[in-house]
Amino acid sequence: MTLPRTPSQTVGPYYAIGLSRDPQNELAKRNDPGALRLIGQLIDGEGSPIGDGMIEIWDAAGHRWGRSGTDADGRFSFVVTKPDALPGEAPRFDVFVFARGLLRHELTRIYFPDETAANAADPVLSALDGAGAATLVAEEEDGALRWDVRMQGDRATVFFTH
């Protein structure tokens, strides 16, 4: 027998009603100089993919944003160029994570692996312990940047109060 999801197991009715799951995931054209594929997977506390989530990324300087629903395997993708850094900070994207069971979206960040000096000087990233900071830095993988979101458990992504 299959039971319907309870309200606490969903993002709520407005997720389906008010938001389109149509991808708005190209913040840059694929042939733009410096264009990168940003890929990842949304994973729950048991290590299973979250196939009905949504990831929104915002250029920290506020110039661009994009949205990608997750597929059945929890995968999402974007086409981006590296955003400008704010003064005294490393280049990054701010990220909102929407997933079942959350009454409010979670906030986190994506930093770039080739910005070692800027990442070390970033006031937020440098305040985290090594394991926590590592959850916010994308990794290079087959010509793309990979950044997974782990909601709980081992290597859980760091989330911020907002």
Regions found by a protein language model. Name each.
Residues 1-134, 139-162:
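Beta-strand-dominated extracellular/periplasmic modules and repeats
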